[in-house]
UniProtKB/Swiss-Prot annotation:
It comes from Rhizobium etli. This is Protein RecA. It is found in: Cytoplasm. The gene is recA. One of its GO terms (biological process) is SOS response. The keyword DNA damage applies. The lineage of its organism: Bacteria, Pseudomonadati, Pseudomonadota, Alphaproteobacteria, Hyphomicrobiales. One of its GO terms (cellular component) is cytosol. GO terms for molecular function: ATP binding; ATP hydrolysis activity; ATP-dependent DNA damage sensor activity; damaged DNA binding; single-stranded DNA binding. SUPFAM superfamilies: P-loop containing nucleoside triphosphate hydrolases (SSF52540), RecA protein, C-terminal domain (SSF54752).
Amino acid sequence: MSQNSLRLVEDKSVDKSKALEAALSQIERSFGKGSIMKLGSNENVIEIETISTGSLGLDIALGVGGLPKGRIIEIYGPESSGKTTLALQTIAESQKKGGICAFVDAEHALDPVYARKLGVDLQNLLISQPDTGEQALEITDTLVRSGAVDVLVVDSVAALTPRAEIEGEMGDSLPGLQARLMSQALRKLTASISKSNTMVIFINQIRMKIGVMFGSPETTTGGNALKFYASVRLDIRRIGSVKEREEVIGNQTRVKVVKNKMAPPFKQVEFDIMYGEGVSKTGELVDLGVKAGIVEKSGAWFSYNSQRLGQGGENAKTFLRDNPDLAREIELALRENAGLIADRFLQNGGPDADDGDGADM
């Protein structure tokens, strides 16, 4: 008895390797080649493919240079905070690289004129305006499984009305119906999204929980499933107005990375969203450039590599808008120093009470 046990200990490594080989071959016979492999044997798995959000500061805050492909993203916030704008800017950036994009407009509120102003190629944008939540998610599932779509936006989770609710009476009480619909859909979608390398962005609204004494009373619609399945959750808020004399020409916006499976979360960034233009890219170049020491500020004058950009922020932005090559050069310099900028200059919001139940990892 003791000899057998000794022999097992001596041959333990050999037995384990043989047992592992037998298990791997059995799995491959049952489920096909490639159903299991060593992670390092496929270099493509390690690379994270991303698409820019249209905001340089947010790309840096995300830690990987943009939103990751093959993942579920949630963008939520109050009304008129810039949720759809951010999603459309991501579509525009993907289309610039030749990507195929789709927009599932459950709210039936997409403005094609505004989308074109943000740089979206309407001729090549797939759009669906479904009648029910089930139809919207079935269309999403079919497009994801095709493997041909790079970015798919669902606007919004709150508008994914279950068929039973539409067919029922106005005052009918149907608790948990939308949450169950989302939970089932995400269980089906998550594997297909990863295999097809499609980025699926769910836009969500916030609601108030009644009777909350401590912490934030805010919560997102559609139950808890999306919070768990999302790799990145962005909380977007309007914090002020951009004015030209007395006229309001844009919004000051703050985005907090509430959840991030790709890099450290809780980074916070602020930028301007201009009406009819989207994210002010030149404004970000000037602001981040000064913080990182790439753009020099002397009094009211801004300069880069001894070349004057202009007196005052607005003149510097106009100069960069008129000189796209120089703007691109500053952007590349900022992206090269992304790690330093993220650590030193992007505010770390931390999991505070403002996140409510949204700060989960």
